């Protein structure tokens, strides 16, 4: 008698894993990677690892089962071809941003859809998510907006001081 479990039990475990990853991820991106070389996929994985982003390749049928279980049936039409699933653990946009930036240099990778704030977004929506500023960019913009009035006041004070001299 063999030690291997039935295939359907292994598949059920993978579906549970996918459900768990989707639930715990801040954001999910789905990209088609047809014709992407192993070297390029490795490069993408290395970039993802640096940003605490998980990249997984699952059978679309298993992701379909997980999507149905989570009530994300709008995701099902995007589960065709060879897909890679990118799970962002830090914030909701970094998965989409990673794929969009990588796809600019690698036409074999195409951003297809994603899950943003618990909702399925199509290709247009996930590209919009990818174009949003990151947390660091937002902090920088906020700090600049706080400093602007102070800089303006300092310039006025310097102008007055120079006219008195």
Swiss-Prot record:
GO molecular function list: large ribosomal subunit rRNA binding
Show the InterPro entries listed in the entry. Answer: Ribosomal_uL10, Ribosomal_uL10-like_sf, Ribosomal_uL10_bac, Ribosomal_uL10_bac_type
User: Which Pfam families does the entry mention?
Assistant: Ribosomal_L10
A single GO BP term for this record reads:
translation
GO cellular component terms, alphabetically, are: ribonucleoprotein complex; ribosome
Keywords from the named record: Ribonucleoprotein, Ribosomal protein, RNA-binding, rRNA-binding
Stored CDD domains? Ribosomal_L10 (cd05797)
SUPFAM superfamilies membership? Ribosomal protein L10-like (SSF160369)
**What function does the entry list?**
Forms part of the ribosomal stalk, playing a central role in the interaction of the ribosome with GTP-bound translation factors.
- Could you tell me which HAMAP family the record lists for this protein? Ribosomal_uL10
Family, according to the entry, reads as follows: Belongs to the universal ribosomal protein uL10 family.
What is the annotated quaternary arrangement, including any partners?
Answer: Part of the ribosomal stalk of the 50S ribosomal subunit. The N-terminus interacts with L11 and the large rRNA to form the base of the stalk. The C-terminus forms an elongated spine to which L12 dimers bind in a sequential fashion forming a multimeric L10(L12)X complex.
Protein name (record): Large ribosomal subunit protein uL10
């Amino acid at each position: 008698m063999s030690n291997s479990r039935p295939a359907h039990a292994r598949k059920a475990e993978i579906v549970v894993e996918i459900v768990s990853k989707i639930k715990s991820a801040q954001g999910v991106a789905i990209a088609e990677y047809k014709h992407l070389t192993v070297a390029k996929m490795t490069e993408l994985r290395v970039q993802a690892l640096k940003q605490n982003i998980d990249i997984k390749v699952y059978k679309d049928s298993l992701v379909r089962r997980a999507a149905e279980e989570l009530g994300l049936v709008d995701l099902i039409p995007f589960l065709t071809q060879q897909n890679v699933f990118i799970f962002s653990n830090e914030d909701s946009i970094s998965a989409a941003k990673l794929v969009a930036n990588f796809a600019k240099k690698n036409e074999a990778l195409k951003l297809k859809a994603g899950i943003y704030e618990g909702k399925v977004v199509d290709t247009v929506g996930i590209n919009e998510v990818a174009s949003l500023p990151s947390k660091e960019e937002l902090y920088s913009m906020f700090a600049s907006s706080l400093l602007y009035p102070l800089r303006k006041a300092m310039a006025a004070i310097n102008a007055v001081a120079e006219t008195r001299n």
